[in-house]
Amino acid sequence: MLRSCAMRLRTLGATPARRPEATRRLFSSEEVVCKDYALPNPSWTKDLRLLFDQFMKKCEDGSWKRLPSYRQNPPQALQEFQTHFVDSKFKKEEQMSKAQQFTRSLEEGLGFEYAMFYNKAEKRIVCLFQGGLHLQGMPGFVHGGAIATIIDITAGMCAFSEGIVMTANLNIDYKKPIPLLSVVVVNSQLQKIEGRKLFVSCTIQSTDEKTLHTQATALFIKLDPDKPLT
């Protein structure tokens, strides 16, 4: 994942001796006051709204959970992350308080429109993604870097269910281009864990599952709170 994605969607806060508070908060039903951007807005197409409603139905029996998504990390969460993982000489609290998550930094409809759903039993994350007009690469199609980003954060969420992680490796095979404003399904699953290494697979398919746009594998490393990142 991109370095900023290590904190994406998460109310970060971890205590070294137990399950990271960030993970507990994200995958629980704890109320938060930040605006949740993983909810329908006027830019969502009919296809995206339909898929969203279908997955919300799946959430009713508790097998799936919709994950929230925020533009900024709460100040307390940011401070806790920096305390455990950032060397004090590199902390820039005033600047960091103004930082925004990359995937939520564009106006609605222009960039990354998506919602994620988590299945704990299957160790799986499904992301419903609509690429906006400001994500263009070749005319009419989503940029490969934007595709890599949505894979990174979706696969990263699978790994994040096991603790606070960052990307070590991302291997992507681009099969078919994704048209702008189309809706695709990003499906990621945690395959295995070896110590601090977490291996995740990911695919992007059309909503009818007839077109495979992308295949990917990713390796994430669980962060050690005793070893600062900087």
UniProtKB/Swiss-Prot annotation:
The modification Phosphoserine is found at residues 28-29. Keywords: Acetylation, Apoptosis, Cell membrane, Cell projection, Cytoplasm, Fatty acid metabolism, Hydrolase, Lipid metabolism, Membrane, Mitochondrion, Mitochondrion inner membrane, Phosphoprotein, Transit peptide. InterPro entries: HotDog_dom_sf, THEM4/THEM5_acyl-CoA_thioest, Thioestr_dom. Substrate binds at residues 175, 196-197. It is a peripheral membrane protein. The modification N6-succinyllysine is found at residues 46, 57, 89, 98, 197. One of its GO terms (molecular function) is long-chain fatty acyl-CoA hydrolase activity. This is Acyl-coenzyme A thioesterase THEM4. Its EC number is 3.1.2.2.
